[in-house]
Amino acid sequence: MSSDYEKEVLRRTLEHERGTWREDLRRRFAPWFDPLVWGFRCHDGWSGIITELTEEIARIVGGPEGAPDLRVVEVKEKLGGLRYYVWHVPEKHALAIAEAKQRAEERSFETCEVCGKPGRLVQSDGYWHTACPAYEDPRSFRGD
């Protein structure tokens, strides 16, 4: 970690994630999520998709021991879909991991990011997100 700022962001992120699926994923698949300074930048509705994708990557490579240099560097929502960025993927597993990521990203466009119920891609005031009817208005979950 390169700066005091990043260390403070990580400290706050880990504090925020304490007791959640995010903390569990970091624990189960360490060192893959070390440091993931910015945390998981999406709502809890995609927790199942993210967990299943991570478990699938683990099956593909043989667990963290099979790819000790692999790093999940960012997990976020972008333009309504899941983005899961991984570095240092073993070349022999690159295609299988890319296909697994593609399937997870496709599922995210059918799953409400907030609650995990079936959803659809919607646009509201220039903001694209995947939501069920209860969360189509971004103000319903962003606190605006």
Where are these regions (language model features)?
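Cys/His-clustered metal-coordination modules, chiefly Zn-binding fingers
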Residues: 95-144
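Interaction interfaces in information-processing and related assembly proteins
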Residues: 15-98
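Aromatic-residue detector
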Residues: 8-11, 20, 46, 114
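Eukaryotic low-complexity, non-globular regulatory regions
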Residues: 1-5, 9-13
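Sequence-level detector for tyrosine residue identity
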Residues: 5, 16, 84-85, 127, ...
